[in-house]
């Protein structure tokens, strides 16, 4: 046990302005307490939402900003009231690091929907210090917002599961879509989409990948194990697939029409939005009404669901398809990610990188 009373500094890579360019930044870690873990970051995934934040696409960014919310690390020290973790444990943490602990979502293991949640970066913690993310040597996180990484899952493979993995696992469970035999669609084959294929297939679903071009067909069918592939501009193919899917994960992070995909859903089908888009999406209401279809959304998952998802992935042998990079490559990686030039998630080897 440690008191965690002394102030610590660390070095991360931060954006200073909406250009989004990251460079070394040394800063003080937030005040720590008896429920906190002091963690050495081992690996951190690179998510498309990191781009939205560092470039102020949502109009709420504060600088300097150290991004990164798919974090796996090693516990260096624990507070006096920590009961679940010990020094040396390998743990993961995600985009939410605080909540009010008293609202309905918090009391029902859905703390990610707390209106007073604290983001792991680009936010302010309860002690007034800015939160900073996982593109850094060390972090401090409360015990409630940490999960143990199962043995057998490599750190760099586990990191994307903290966001991309649970983003698809949670709605499948919450919306009653976990049973085998369902027919699902994955719109967009990126970091979240490729995990959607893997997790849905592991649940026994028939999976159709829907993409804007034919270039990912072989990857989707032969490498990820999808059952079918649709090109959204193929009018005949889209027409043949009308009323064929129980659900579609819409992972696309840019404005796009919804009508072509609503048409693919069966009666009571669900279009589940998971891509962050800072502009209105449009559809005509009869496409929803006449099939009792739902357009809904889902945001990551609870810590309980994250634990379940990690065990599920371990049991099924599921891992992320990744490209491991050093921190000095992260700006190039962000540029490539904007162009969808990655299969399928960049992961920063933080512990193996020179940070200053």
UniProtKB/Swiss-Prot annotation:
Annotated binding of NADP(+), by residue: 49, 167, 188-193, 211-216, 251, 275, 298-300
Keywords tagged on the record: Lignin biosynthesis, Metal-binding, NADP, Oxidoreductase, Zinc
EC number: 1.1.1.195
One Gene Ontology molecular-function label: cinnamyl-alcohol dehydrogenase activity
Enzyme class: oxidoreductase
Known function: Involved in lignin biosynthesis. Catalyzes the final step specific for the production of lignin monomers. Catalyzes the NADPH-dependent reduction of coniferaldehyde, 5-hydroxyconiferaldehyde, sinapaldehyde, 4-coumaraldehyde and caffeyl aldehyde to their respective alcohols.
Protein name: Probable cinnamyl alcohol dehydrogenase 2
Source lineage: Eukaryota, Viridiplantae, Streptophyta, Embryophyta, Tracheophyta
Gene designation: CAD2
